[in-house]
């Protein structure tokens, strides 16, 4: 923490320059939010980020096989890099109206906060850590990641940290607004699609054939009745269910999708086994009721998402530095749990946190999403101090 305080003082001229460019950072935020980037379709937004990397003179600018846009600022020493990442993708379909409008002090529109803010501030830091006014001891890699949201399943982060970033010294993910939260605990999740398939038929003439919807409903009912631990907190939800052709048909297929979350990898393992067992029990029960000579119902289980969990210890230097940097800008540190790009390095033992990039925001993942740049410069200064405390001021 003492090193963080020293770093913060040394960076005072940088904090002043970034504050002077506050309007430009917000303009970049508006620009990036208006470039469509649905999960899996981040190419156009990634290209815009790549051009900004070139404008700022980063080295080794490239797009990897997962679509991550990477740029590097060399350090004065040949050491493992500090990684700054911000996700490119949004939850909004391509056809969404991405216009950003002002409502009083707020900017309102899809993606203006999550993650237009994170991308804009990552680029502002890339511009300020220019190798002359501000130089770092360690190299710093700037990574605009793909597939952070929903079905993206942390695709970009998983690819980057499995390969190029596997030896990173530390990682700071910039995600949305805020200047107090320090996400050092990674909420893990597993998602499954259970599918039932049977012969189907007419609701009268084929009565007695196993009913795929009955099996799916039976599985959902059993899952809903499970007793889940509060410590470590574990949640399970049947998020979607469907099947059948018409009201007067015995469905030949049905499916349900399940979201399982926990802070414990052991609990994720345990409840995955429970889910698989219940899926089979529901099929067995429906088959036990079928008429002689009818084809049996079958069940399949597909994994449609897996986000790892873990924790960077609150006593670790990176977390302590983030706590001190938050206090140095006059804010109150809030140690938190969430699912972010930082899940991946945390699960691999790489020290990592996710933080907000300044200002205030709300209504994420809706068309009413908003950002208010109140004290936005404070969050930018905090982010720079945390990054440079990890990388070392040269």
Where are the model-predicted features located?
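N-terminal hydrophobic or amphipathic helices/low-complexity stretches enriched
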Residues: 1-35, 186-188
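Metal-dependent amide/peptide-bond hydrolase catalytic core
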Residues: 1-13, 34, 212-394
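Active-site metal-coordination/substrate-binding segment of hydrolases
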Residues: 24, 50, 54, 62, ...
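A non-catalytic alpha/beta surface segment that caps or lines the substrate-entry region
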Residues: 28-31, 35-80
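Acidic-glycine-rich active-site phosphate/pyrophosphate-binding loop
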Residues: 88-102, 168, 184-195, 324, ...
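Glycine/charged-rich beta-loop-alpha catalytic/anionic-binding loops adjacent to active sites
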Residues: 98-111, 197-201, 327, 363-367
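Acidic/histidine-rich catalytic neighborhood of metal-dependent amide-processing enzymes
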Residues: 106, 111, 115-187, 229, ...
């Amino acid at each position: 923490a003492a090193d963080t305080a020293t770093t913060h003082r040394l960076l005072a001229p940088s904090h002043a320059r970034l504050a002077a460019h506050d309007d430009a950072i917000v303009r970049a935020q508006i620009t990036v939010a208006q470039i469509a980037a649905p999960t899996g379709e981040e190419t156009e937004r990634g290209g815009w980020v790549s051009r900004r990397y070139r404008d700022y003179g980063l080295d080794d600018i490239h797009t990897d096989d997962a679509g991550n846009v990477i740029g590097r600022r060399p350090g004065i020493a040949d050491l493992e890099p500090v990684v700054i990442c911000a996700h490119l993708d949004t939850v909004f379909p391509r056809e969404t109206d991405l216009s950003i409008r002002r409502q009083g002090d707020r900017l309102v529109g899809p993606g203006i906060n999550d993650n237009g803010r994170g991308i804009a501030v990552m680029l502002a830091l890339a511009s300020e850590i220019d190798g002359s006014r501000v130089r770092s001891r360690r190299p710093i890699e700037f990574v605009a990641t793909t597939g952070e949201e929903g079905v993206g399943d942390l695709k970009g982060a998983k690819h980057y940290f499995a390969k190029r970033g596997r030896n990173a010294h530390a990682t700071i993910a910039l995600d949305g607004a805020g200047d107090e939260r320090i996400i050092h605990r990674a909420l893990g999740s597993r998602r499954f699609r259970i599918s039932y398939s049977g012969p189907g038929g007419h609701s009268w003439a084929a009565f007695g054939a196993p009913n795929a919807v009955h099996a799916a409903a039976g599985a959902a009912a059993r899952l809903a009745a499970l007793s889940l631990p509060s410590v470590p907190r574990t949640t399970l939800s049947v998020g979607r269910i469907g099947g059948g052709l018409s009201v007067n048909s015995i469905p030949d297929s049905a499916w349900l999708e399940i979201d399982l979350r926990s802070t414990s990898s052991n609990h994720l393992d345990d409840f995955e086994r429970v889910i698989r067992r219940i899926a089979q029990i529901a099929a067995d029960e429906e088959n036990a009721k079928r008429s002689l000579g009818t084809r049996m119902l079958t069940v399949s289980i597909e994994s449609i998402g897996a986000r790892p969990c873990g924790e960077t210890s609150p006593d670790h230097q990176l977390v302590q530095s983030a706590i001190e940097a938050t206090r140095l800008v006059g804010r109150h540190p809030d140690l938190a749990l969430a699912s972010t790009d930082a899940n991946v390095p945390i699960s691999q033992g790489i020290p990592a946190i996710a933080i907000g990039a300044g200002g205030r925001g709300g209504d994420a993942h809706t068309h009413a999403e908003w950002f208010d740049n109140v004290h936005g410069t404070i969050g930018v200064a905090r982010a720079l101090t945390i990054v440079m405390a990890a990388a070392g001021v040269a």
